[in-house]
Amino acid sequence: MEKTYDPKAIEKKWADYWEKRQLSKPTAQGSPYCIMLPPPNVTGTLHMGHGFQQTLMDTLIRYHRMKGERTLWQGGTDHAGIATQMVVEQQLAQEDLTREDLGRQAFIKRVWEWRERSGGKITHQMRRLGVSIDWSRERFSMDEGLSRATTEAFIRLHHEGLIYRGKRLVNWDPKLNTAISDLEVVTEEVEGHLWHIRYPLAEGSGHLIIATTRPETLLGDVAIAVHPQDERYQPFVGKKVRLPLTDRTIPVIADEAVDKEFGTGSLKITPGHDFNDYEIGQRHQLPLINILTSEGYLNENVPEPYRGLERFEARKKIIADLQRENLLEKTEPYRVPVPRGERSGVIIEPLLTDQWFIKMEALAKPAMEAVESGELKFIPKNWEKTYLQWLSNIQDWCISRQLWWGHRLPVWYDEEKNSYVGRSREEILKKYHLSPDVKLQQETDVLDTWFSASLWPFATLGWPEKTESFKTFYPTQVLVTGFDIIFFWVARMVMMGLKLTHKIPFHSVYIHGLIRDSQGRKMSKSKGNVIDPIDIIDGISLDALIEKRTHALLQPKMAKTIEKMTRKEFPNGIASFGTDALRFTFCALASRGRDINFDMGRIDGYRNFCNKIWNAARFVTMNTQEKDLNPEKPLSYSAADEWIRTRLQQTIKNAEEALSQYRFDLLAQTLYEFTWNEYCDWYVEFAKCILYDKQAKPAQLRGTRVALLEVLEILLRLLHPVMPFITEEIWQTVAPLAGKEGKSIMVEHWPQFNIHEMNYDAKVEIEWVKNVITAIRTLRAEIGISPAKRIPVIFGKGDEKDKKRIAKMKSYIKTLGKVSQLRFAKHDDCFSATATGIVERLEIHIPLAGVIDKQTEIARLKKEISKLQKEEEKSLKKLDNPNYLQRAPQEVVEKERLSLEKTQNALKKLQSQYASIESL
């Protein structure tokens, strides 16, 4: 093994090795275990959320593969309709072309060319993360099989009357000219205005005043709504007002949805351009007026002076005209929530359009029953409530998009606009008994990306055909995903799975938190706080990081702020940490049900953990290679050997429990504590006492060498699911020494807990001697004895058991405690000039004479005592102040009391030491 651990030297080697030998294929004979990768966008690059989620999935997959299960991690990418179309359109724009210039077929050809050329970036990055996906089965949501499955699903749902075409309000992106889902809308609060507008009464004098943040939609108003219990407006309900700037009158209606406290308490109702107004309009059977074109210009349904104006230009003119006609009461500043398209960046409009929908109520009921009956489980369980609430309030799903890239709807129209659904023109002619001469035009819309994504768990396995893969791996075991897509993806997969396969698509849903920055903020390009996981693995210079964060910002003015923040947070850029340190960090941070604030300090600690493992493995191999490890010869285990073997069994049990409960954080904690605190810090040091003892017998040496090797080899297998690269590299050296043969640790057996390997007496003895050594080390540190200086130790009190243990563990205590000589106290020993510690009944005394410099130590103690006395005085002053006790929060007062207690205890200890040293 090399002297230092260099992840760059090994990671690509082992990733290529695993893939070349197809070790991720489901070849084992055990029970099937399958996880579906939430397909990342083909346009995407790996971000921290991907890295976190895929680490958790890979940990599960590697664990179950090692348990001998027939394990499949089904991977693939999503065609990402809007995102991909935008990327290719931007490329065309650089050639001064539009998609319309190319035409649909040529444009689709260009998209496929782009996908072949650039679409594999994210899967390459995933390989860097070490994910053990079966790449030979990789799917793409637009490949032939998945396209066939998507068409089949649409046709079956339509045949059952669950798909229909209708006019409804949708999120409309005027730049992309398509409907988009709620998930593709990003709402941000900006400084805006609240305009108070007078609506004159149609009869008599007077007016009602409404407050709005969107005066341009006034031209589509069809009513004024007030709360039925609002006494101010009860006399006006049923009357009419004149709609400003038009020749229309509209009614005043009462509806409980109106917020009496907002604005003036009266609300303009524009059902064609507001989702809440649409619901009110439906209840009161109000007309729907659409005043916008698909590009966001005012249409022919508005008075002539406003036709053709861009929506925000129209706003300016309407405000000016209202002022001129004395209909603008006042304008006040107001924080306005503005919905923007995630991809286009433009403000989204609720727009009334003809779209295709799925009736969701009938699909939602069995999906709810699956959770209520316990057939489908959420982890943590509290997410079941969120899932059920969403499904109980479900609306019909708009599945059509006005794009060119995607699954085209299997719908054709004749010249009379009659629609026909089928797999092809030929099938439709036959199915509907149409003349071969009839002219049929296919629907230009494509399906929402989430529609094909909802089929992912079974379509990727061959559905609608009953393939071997489908029969073996469906339903899958667990879905690992974030809470933000429980409704958009999880619930829809459950509904589609139950409807089309009559089975739930997975037995469990593990919901993880979102990765945020160190301050708890969501990571986003606009905030400039995104960290690329590959940059953590490989490292990146400060200049390159700033360039990456400030390039192609939607708001270029943020560049200076982002640069300043980046320089402060990463003054030296980001160091190279390697994949295993990053993966271990992700697992360690994966507390159930909580978002994760990513702290670079944690990953620095886990890089040190990698180094610790490496150095321990080097020590083991250096002390076992070409040594006598003959299993035929007798061996004798020391108490420390028995102790570490016992602790290993407990670690196996704890790791198994943590994984079975999806407690990745507890898994990491268990492995870290055993590896660092017990194997490296204690056992390796205990082993040296045997290995470096010239009096040690061959059987003792063999016992310790075998224990070092066997425990390390098993520990590597426990660590492997989380840290695949370093464990594979070390295992390839360690396994032959431990008498194991195999092509990869990846397909070795997961360690089995064996209660017969546990020696409780050795456990008690070694924990006792650890406490004794720790007490000696603590006393040395407290009185300032150099770590290299050997000291005498006298034991007082204790019993026969303690004496036997000390005799047995003498070499451990002397070596690890840096003790020159140790003995039990005599009757005439005086302990006034000693530092004293206690372990159970045993007293530990370090004579101070000749061990320390009296005057130097007295000066140091005086300084420390003075410092603590000032802290004590400060705390007492606070706690004696009645005002402080009354006004400060209870938890602050309690914290101060605990601080005082801690200070006083430390003070007593130092004063005792001072008295002891002064008496020398």
Swiss-Prot record:
ATP binds at K525. GO terms for molecular function: aminoacyl-tRNA deacylase activity; ATP binding; valine-tRNA ligase activity. Residues 642-668, 849-920 form a coiled coil. It comes from the Bacteria. Keywords: Aminoacyl-tRNA synthetase, ATP-binding, Coiled coil, Cytoplasm, Ligase, Nucleotide-binding, Protein biosynthesis. Gene3D superfamilies: HUPs (3.40.50.620), Isoleucyl-tRNA Synthetase, Domain 1 (1.10.730.10), Valyl-tRNA synthetase, C-terminal domain (1.10.287.380), Valyl/Leucyl/Isoleucyl-tRNA synthetase, editing domain (3.90.740.10). One of its GO terms (biological process) is valyl-tRNA aminoacylation. Pfam families: Anticodon_1, tRNA-synt_1, Val_tRNA-synt_C. One of its GO terms (cellular component) is cytosol. A motif ('KMSKS' region) lies at residues 522-526. Catalyzes the attachment of valine to tRNA(Val). As ValRS can inadvertently accommodate and process structurally similar amino acids such as threonine, to avoid such errors, it has a 'posttransfer' editing activity that hydrolyzes mischarged Thr-tRNA(Val) in a tRNA-dependent manner. Belongs to the class-I aminoacyl-tRNA synthetase family. ValS type 1 subfamily. This is Valine--tRNA ligase. It comes from Coxiella burnetii (strain RSA 493 / Nine Mile phase I). The lineage of its organism: Bacteria, Pseudomonadati, Pseudomonadota, Gammaproteobacteria, Legionellales.
